[in-house]
């Protein structure tokens, strides 16, 4: 149980984790207990492979655009299929994190060898998945008692969601033109190490447009430090990015960089509800970090394909 609506990010590790409000969280802290109605589980079967400059964020936005924000009806989603098995852990975190935008109580991915390796590299004395057979971590037969969704990643292209809902998502090339005053790469869903690398791949040897502010808030200090060691942070700063502290910050409308009434922002965050990132008059588009970086270069909504290294 977590005190944030994006607590389901931990589903990437096979944990059934969901967010609750302050009152319920206080009760959990006091008693160590909470109540939960066992939900149905809907299967999201991901086939194929992600193409150039297309990421887990594009998968979620495509699902939001196709099925809306009540796709899961506050029940559980399990992401599965060969595309999920091939995904690195940070991409899996993005899928489970934004299951909330699909109306899910929790998003889950069954643990596998990649999960075990990730956990062993970070907490070898506390977490051992090999204490149990692989079948222990797999979904039970018949457990997907809800709806079945499928998405062919071979045909997926970079997505963007227009204001003021993730459900307004469509292929970038299907949207009307849009100009931006702010580009934001941040939040738990859009500024992990792989996200920073993707943005740097677009911004290397390029500069941001004079009409736009590029703001970057890495998802964690550990990811920021590793990105710095790899030269990623230097590429972002050389392109014109201002690096902000690792915090929720602008994603929740906090801090001195919150959006003004006349700002139009393209953001790698999870939500673009009216007023979420600042003034109610501001407008927020959602996209992958690579697409945000591409927009930072041109100042406009831009397909990132062909811009990477």
Map each language-model feature to its residues.
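Fe-S-dependent hydro-lyases/dehydratases of central metabolism
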Residues: 1-309
């Amino acid at each position: 149980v977590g005190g944030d609506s994006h607590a389901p990010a931990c589903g990437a590790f096979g944990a059934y984790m969901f967010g609750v409000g302050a009152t319920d969280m206080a009760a959990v802290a006091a008693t160590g207990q909470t109540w939960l109605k066992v939900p149905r589980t809907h299967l999201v079967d991901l086939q194929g492979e992600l193409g150039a400059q297309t990421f887990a964020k594009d998968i979620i936005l495509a699902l939001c655009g196709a099925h809306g924000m009540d796709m899961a009806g506050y029940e559980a989603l399990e992401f599965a299929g060969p595309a999920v098995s091939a995904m690195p852990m940070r991409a899996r975190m993005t899928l489970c994190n934004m299951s909330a935008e699909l109306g899910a109580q929790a998003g889950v991915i069954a643990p596998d060898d990649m999960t075990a390796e990730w956990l062993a590299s970070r907490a070898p004395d506390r977490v051992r998945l090999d204490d149990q057979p692989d079948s222990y971590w797999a979904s039970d037969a018949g457990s997907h008692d809800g709806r079945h969704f499928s998405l062919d990643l071979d045909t997926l292209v970079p997505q963007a969601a227009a204001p003021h809902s993730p459900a307004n998502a469509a292929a970038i090339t299907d949207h009307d033109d849009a100009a931006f005053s702010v580009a934001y790469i941040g939040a738990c869903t859009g500024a992990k190490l792989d996200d920073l690398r993707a943005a740097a791949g677009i911004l290397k040897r390029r500069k941001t447009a004079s009409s736009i502010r590029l703001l970057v808030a890495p998802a964690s200090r550990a990811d920021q430090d590793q990105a710095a060691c790899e030269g990623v942070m230097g590429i972002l700063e050389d392109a014109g990015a201002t690096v902000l502290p690792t915090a929720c910050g602008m994603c929740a409308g906090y801090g001195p960089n919150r959006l003004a009434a006349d700002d139009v922002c393209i953001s790698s965050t999870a939500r673009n509800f009216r007023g979420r990132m600042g003034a109610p008059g501001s407008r927020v588009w959602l996209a992958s970090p690579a697409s945000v970086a591409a927009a930072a270069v041109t100042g406009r909504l831009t397909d990132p394909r062909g811009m990477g290294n």
